[in-house]
Structures are given as C-alpha cells and as structure tokens.
C-alpha cells in the first residue's frame, strides 16, 4: 500500500521570493506530479482565505451616539461612515484575544488610526487609515472593540450578543460592526511545467500571497498546509510508517526498518552548514531527522530556508520526508542494526 504515496514525486524545492511590499510574497514549489499544482494550490488558497484566524473590529462606542445613523456634533462624518472606515482597520493583538482600544483626538483636522492610544498589547498596522474629520476645537473620544476570530461575522451576531449579555466588557452605547477576520487579502495561483532530468510532465506551482501584515505570507501558507494535514489525518486508517516498513520488508527481506532510517546523517551529501546544524541539534540518524517538522528545523540556529530545501530534496530521493512518525524509535541496539543495514 505504501507504494501509492512513496512512488509519487514530492516537492524538493520551495523558493520564497519577496515582493516590493513586506506583506506580499511569492512561493515557488516544484516539482509536483502532473495535476497536483492545481489540486494543492486551490486547497491552500481556499483554506488561507477562509480559515486562518485574525483580528478585526467588532464594535465601537462613542459618547452621545446610540445607533449607526447618529449625527455627531463637529464631526463631518456620521456614525455609519465611521463604522465603514473602521471596518478596514488592521490590528494585531499581542497578549490577548480581545481588547478595547481608545482613540483620542482634537480638531480641527483629519483623524487617522495613528490617534489610537499606543499600548504594549497591540500594534496598529495601517496607521494612515482615515477615520473622520473634526471641526475646530472639537474633542473626540471613541472606544474600539477588537477580538480574534476567523472568516466573516455580521454585526447582527454581535448586536444580539450585546443585548443578551453574551459580549463581555460592552457598554450601553455599544454599536456592533461587521467583522472580517481573515489576515489574507489575496492569493493568486500560477502553474507552469517543471522538469526532472529529461522529463517535463511535472508541475511548478507559484503562489502569490498578500496579507494584512499581522501574519507573514509564508507563515500563512504553512498554517494552511497544517490545517489541511490535520483535517485529512482523520481519513488515514493505517499506520504510515508500518505500511512503509511492510513495503520495505517485502522488497528487501527481514530487516524491520527502511534501511535509510538507520543511516547516519553524516552519509548524506549535504552542505557544511546543514551538516553542522544537524550535528549541533543532536540529529544522528535519518530516523531522527524525518521525525522533525519543517517548523522544528527552521527554529534550529543558523538553519535557513536554503538548508531546508536541501534536506527536503535529499529525503525525497529516498521516498522520505520531514514530519514522519516512526513508532518505537530509536530501536534497541541501533548501532548494530545500522551496521546490519550498511552491510546489506
């Protein structure tokens, strides 16, 4: 059964190309089996646009305003305009999932998101956002309610929650707003042909991702991939490594492990930097290495995306990959087993 996935080509290279804006990035993934670029690209795009958690304004509170159609003295815009403007406010909360921000300003002049009172608990990502325009000597103060969530939540839900007492820290003048939580603004796919040796019937997937700045584009892709992995795991009714071991035993005979798992990483043709990173992280055998995730590896000092691509390519050549589960690892007498495999 393991041949169903072991015989497929896995991506050996993931290149990250930064754009002119820090919130825009292109990822180039290759090689992929024919048709897989569209399959994986669409799945990643849908998850990124719908299921990643972010932060959004879900309500405001202004003294003297009881509903969206209230006209404010000395303010050019009415409350409905303020609500519309604040729906585009992008904030990142650092130490909590819910917070009340305060905006204080005095006219005359334009009021932007830069007037939101600074705090160590949040970061305003678009401080140049226009909020309202004040007349001369007009004092303006507003509470802005921000929380975390996913997708889109209409104002009616928060309005109902505030009336029933289900929304915490909400005052009597609370005005609910529509909340759009997705930190990903745009995902574009481009698919080209890729080559392995003389064969050109492989896919290259290019993902252009734009976020609001609360999450890096490459992290958004990684989180989306993890969500898909977790959701699809429920469909797997067998042990991946056990099936791989059975396949190896069938082909090679008696030994209980894929011989590659018992090889030492020193045998791999890696750069000096990659070798040193593995050594410093006490990774001795390939069996140790494959159980690490990409996130684990990227947290290793001096280990970057280039080293990660190099290791992915080497493992793919052995039909292995990072993030595998190897039960009962390490085996007893691993040194003897390793020698036995090397002798075979």
Swiss-Prot record:
Residues 254-344 are annotated as: Alpha C-terminal domain (alpha-CTD). It catalyses: RNA(n) + a ribonucleoside 5'-triphosphate = RNA(n+1) + diphosphate. Residues 1-239 are annotated as: Alpha N-terminal domain (alpha-NTD). One of its GO terms (molecular function) is DNA binding. The keyword Nucleotidyltransferase applies. SUPFAM superfamilies: C-terminal domain of RNA polymerase alpha subunit, Insert subdomain of RNA polymerase alpha subunit, RBP11-like subunits of RNA polymerase. InterPro entries: DNA-dir_RNA_pol_insert (IPR011262), DNA-dir_RNA_pol_RpoA/D/Rpb3 (IPR011263), DNA-dir_RpoA (IPR011773), RBP11-like (IPR036603), RNAP_asu_C (IPR011260), RNApol_insert_sf (IPR036643). Keywords: DNA-directed RNA polymerase, Nucleotidyltransferase, Transcription, Transferase. One of its GO terms (biological process) is DNA-templated transcription. Gene3D superfamilies: 5' to 3' exonuclease, C-terminal subdomain, DNA-directed RNA polymerase, insert domain, RNA polymerase, RBP11-like subunit. Its EC number is 2.7.7.6. One of its GO terms (cellular component) is cytoplasm. The N-terminal domain is essential for RNAP assembly and basal transcription, whereas the C-terminal domain is involved in interaction with transcriptional regulators and with upstream promoter elements. Belongs to the RNA polymerase alpha chain family. Homodimer. The RNAP catalytic core consists of 2 alpha, 1 beta, 1 beta' and 1 omega subunit. When a sigma factor is associated with the core the holoenzyme is formed, which can initiate transcription. DNA-dependent RNA polymerase catalyzes the transcription of DNA into RNA using the four ribonucleoside triphosphates as substrates. This is DNA-directed RNA polymerase subunit alpha.
């Amino acid at each position: 059964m393991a041949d169903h996935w072991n015989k497929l080509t896995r991506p050996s290279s993931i290149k990250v190309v930064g754009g002119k804006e820090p919130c825009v990035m292109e990822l180039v993934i290759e090689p992929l089996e024919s048709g897989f670029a569209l399959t994986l690209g669409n799945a990643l795009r849908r998850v990124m646009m719908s299921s990643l958690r972010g932060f959004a304004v879900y309500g405001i509170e202004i003294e003297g305003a009881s509903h969206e159609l209230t006209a404010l003295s000395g303010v050019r815009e009415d409350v409905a305009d303020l609500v519309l403007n604040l729906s585009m406010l992008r904030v990142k909360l650092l130490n909590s999932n819910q917070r009340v921000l305060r905006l204080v300003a005095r006219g005359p002049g334009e009021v932007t998101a830069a007037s939101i009172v600074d705090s160590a608990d949040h970061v305003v990502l678009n401080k140049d956002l226009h909020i309202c325009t004040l007349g001369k000597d007009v004092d303006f103060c507003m509470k802005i309610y921000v929380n975390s969530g996913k997708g889109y939540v209409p104002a009616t839900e928060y309005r109902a929650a505030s009336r029933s007492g289900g929304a915490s820290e909400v005052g009597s003048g609370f005005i609910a707003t529509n909340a759009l939580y997705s930190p990903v603004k745009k995902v574009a796919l481009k698919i080209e042909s890729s080559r392995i040796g003389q064969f050109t019937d492989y896919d290259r997937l290019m993902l252009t991702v734009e976020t609001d700045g609360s999450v890096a584009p490459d992290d958004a892709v990684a989180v989306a991939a993890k969500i898909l992995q977790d959701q699809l795991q429920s469909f797997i009714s067998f042990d991946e490594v056990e099936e791989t071991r059975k396949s190896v035993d069938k082909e090679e005979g008696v030994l209980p492990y894929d011989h590659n798992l018992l090889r030492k990483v020193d045998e791999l043709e890696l750069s000096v930097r990659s070798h040193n990173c593995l050594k410093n992280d006490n990774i001795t055998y390939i069996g140790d290495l494959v159980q690490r995730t990409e996130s684990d590896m990227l947290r290793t000092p001096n280990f970057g995306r280039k080293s990660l691509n190099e290791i992915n390519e080497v493992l793919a050549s052995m039909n292995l990959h990072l993030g595998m589960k190897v039960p009962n690892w390490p085996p007893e007498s691993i040194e003897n087993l390793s020698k036995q495999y090397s002798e075979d």
